[in-house]
Structures are given as C-alpha cells and as structure tokens.
Curated annotation (Swiss-Prot):
Organism: Helicobacter hepaticus (strain ATCC 51449 / 3B1)
Presence of keyword RNA-binding: no
Residue ranges occupied by any CN hydrolase domain in the UniProt entry: 181-400
PANTHER family: APOLIPOPROTEIN N-ACYLTRANSFERASE
The keyword RNA-binding belongs to this UniProt entry's keyword annotation: no
The protein's name: Apolipoprotein N-acyltransferase
Family: Belongs to the CN hydrolase family. Apolipoprotein N-acyltransferase subfamily.
Keywords of the record: Acyltransferase, Cell inner membrane, Cell membrane, Membrane, Transferase, Transmembrane, Transmembrane helix
Pfam families to which the protein is assigned, alphabetical: CN_hydrolase
Lineage top rank: taxon: Bacteria
Subcellular location: Cell inner membrane
Organism classification: Bacteria, Pseudomonadati, Campylobacterota, Epsilonproteobacteria, Campylobacterales
Length: 400
C-alpha cells in the first residue's frame, strides 16, 4: 500500500514520485505480507483491506445510503482478513510464495483490483509474474539467510529489474495532436440535473477551444453527457456533428435502447463523432455492485434501493478508427481489466468518471493498474477524466 499512498500525497502537490522510491516502498510492502507472523495474519489483512478498498463505499453517498459506508469499509477489511488468514496459515516460503503469486487471480464477483504486482507499476522492477516471483524470492533470501547466501537474493533482485524500460515514449505516440479533457463535475444528482445545461455547454466550449488550438482529436470523460444524445434534454447533437468536421470528438454519454415490448435498456457508452458520422461502443465490463449486481441480490436491492445496477452490458470491446489509426475503447473500470488487454492493443482510449470516489486513493489505484497493464502489454493509454488528473500512460517508467 505504501507506494499508492506516497504517490497520492506527492501528486496532490503536483509532484511526480521517483521510480527508485516506488521500488523501495514496493519491496517493503511485499515484505510486510511475506513475513507477517501467522498469529497476526487476520489483523494485517483486515487493515490492508480497509486501506486498499475503503473507497468502494463512497459511491453510497449519492444513493442516500451514507449510513452503510462504515459497514462496507469493515466488510472490506473482514474479507481481506479472512483471505490472509487462510492464505498465510504457514510461515514457510512455499505457502507465502504461492499466496502472493496467486492473489491477483482472486476476483470476488468479478472485481479484479486485488493485484499486488501493481505496487511496482511505476518502479524499476518488472511487473510480470516472473519478476514478481524473483522479487519475493530475493526478499526471502535477504532476510532469512546469512553471509554469502544473501548474494543470491541480490542476484534475484537484479534479474527482477526491467531492463527494457528505455523511455522512447515520443516515438511511441501516434502522429495526432490529442486533447485530453479533464472536467470537475460533482456526482450529486440534484446538482447534475439542475446544472445540466451549463455543464454540457462547458463541454461544447472545450471542444471549440480544442478546435481553435488546432487539435486533431479531443477526448472527453465518461458520461460527460449523462443523458441520451437523442433526448429532448440534449440540444447539442447537431452542433457535435458540425464540429466533427473540424475535430474528432470522443465523448462518454448515456445510451437508451427501446425494445419491441416497450422496455428500455440503458448503456454506458462512448461515442465518436468524425466528419459528420457517429459511432459508439457500449461498456462491456460493468462495475460489480455499481453498474451491475449478482442476480441473487437484485430482488433485495430493488425492494429497498433504486438506481444501483441499472446498466446493461455491451456485447464486445471495439476499436475506433481515427485517421487510419486504431484505438481500443475502454470505459473507466474496463481500462483496469486484464481481459481487455488480451489482444495487446497498441493504443487505448480510456474515459473515466472518478467523481463517485473522490476524495480517495481510488484514482491512484486506477492509474497504477493501467500503468501495470500498459507495461505488461505494451499499450499507450490516453485517459480523459472527471475529478482526477487526465494522463497519457506509457509502457515506460516515467512521470506518465
């Protein structure tokens, strides 16, 4: 956890964290799990769970369920406490080694952010499983053995370093001038409905400003236009079509689909406006307990609470073609999902709305996971955000 919190503090002062510092803090974090006494394993897991995932509860603020926040935070702690209690039952190398290597495969209800390797995302240490295994082995040898055996730990650590980290990001970027919008819109529903006209107008102004500054592409955040674009609440559709002759517009919006029986399905979508034509991709990988719910919980939740789990999932991930360059589209949570990167996309567009979870460590965790996957799969990620810093994330160790 230490690299995440250090990065959070430094970035709040617009300071980049040193890869060397991340490397050292990452090794310390892994060591704190590797060598935890078995009689303290539940307590350590409990506090790690709370510090790592307390932010999950913050979205409840917008559904009049703030009273549940402490319970959810404690539940996160208890869950990770039991995981540590079961996984760290023995203080031997083979058990601790296997636990740390396999922890990233733990995905409760599809939630796949339990990735200990991500502590090395901005470090000099490799993020693949082999490098992680060598780091664990190095720590074990350095702390458990004496005299010349420690040399073996140093050798393991040297081989865990990523020597392919030459920072050639300039040559790796597409030949397009891309504007990443960074908005600051509260998630409060009353505010969003009351100020919709001014918020949407500001987004249109941002697009016009990007045109004036001669950008080729502008990417706006997830749900920047949080109503269906063909609804009476959105008078700017024709303006977007007209502006798209001067700039390619990528923007998040709500999409409504009416079925033959009159039922409506709602999708979290990304639209592309280009030369007067419109295309879109729906979000495929929905957020557990936010945009989707396990089927056994639906009757209970629909009885007491409205507005949670109301989105439908899209069918497939897709690529936007911009000036004959392919960009794979991801919406928020998808950009930190391993399955999304399975085809090794060269360029990725990620749009996010982090208003649900700020102020918290969530944007830092998201950024580190995207950096982790960028390094693992060689992708360049263009991340446009609401209420967190926008960024170009490369496969190289740098401030990005």
């Amino acid at each position: 956890m230490l690299p995440f919190y250090a990065q959070w503090v430094l970035e709040s002062y617009d300071k980049a964290i040193s890869p060397l510092l991340v490397s050292l803090l990452g090794l310390f974090s892994i060591a704190s799990v590797l060598f935890v006494p078995k009689n303290r394993r539940f307590g350590v897991g409990f506090f790690i769970g709370m510090l790592w995932f307390y932010w999950i509860s913050l979205g409840l603020r917008y559904f009049d369920m703030s009273f549940l926040i402490p319970l959810v935070v404690i539940a996160c702690g208890i869950f990770m406490g039991f995981v540590f209690y079961i996984g760290l039952w023995c203080e031997c190398l083979i058990v601790r080694f296997a636990f740390l290597l396999l922890l990233s495969y733990l995905t409760p209800f599809g939630f796949d952010w339990i990735v200990p390797e991500s502590v090395f995302a901005y470090s000099y240490i490799g993020v693949d499983k082999l490098s992680f295994a060598l780091s664990i082995l190095a720590l074990w040898i350095l702390f458990k053995y004496k005299t010349w055996w420690k040399l073996g730990g140093v050798i393991c650590l040297v081989f865990a370093l990523d020597f392919g980290l030459k920072d050639s990001k300039i040559q790796n970027l597409p030949p397009l001038k891309i504007k990443l919008a960074q908005s600051a819109v509260s998630q409060d529903f009353d505010y969003r409905m009351r100020e919709a006209k001014s918020i949407f107008s500001e987004h249109i102004s941002d697009i016009q400003k990007a045109i004036n500054e001669e950008y080729d592409v502008i990417i706006l955040p997830e749900s920047a236009f949080y109503v269906p674009l063909d609804s009476q609440y959105f008078p700017y559709f024709d303006s977007l079509l007209e502006m798209s002759h001067k700039i390619v517009i990528i923007v998040g919006a709500l999409r409504e689909e009416i079925h033959t029986d009159g039922r409506a399905s709602y999708f979290n979508s990304t639209y592309k406006f280009d030369k007067g034509k419109v295309s879109f991709y729906d979000k495929v990988h929905l957020v557990p307990f936010g945009e989707t719910l396990p089927s056994f919980l639906l009757p209970l939740v629909n009885t007491f609470f409205q507005g949670i789990g109301g989105f439908s999932a899209g069918k497939d991930f897709g690529y936007f073609d911009i000036a004959e360059i392919k960009f794979k589209n991801a919406i928020c949570y998808e950009g930190s999902n391993r399955g999304f990167y399975a085809d090794y996309p060269q360029y990725v567009i990620v749009t996010s709305n982090n208003a649900w979870f700020v102020p918290s460590i969530e944007p830092i965790l998201q950024k580190n996971l995207m950096k982790y996957y960028a390094r693992l799969y060689g992708s360049v990620i263009f991340h446009a955000t609401n209420l967190s810093p926008a960024a170009i994330i490369t496969p190289f160790v740098s401030s990005r």
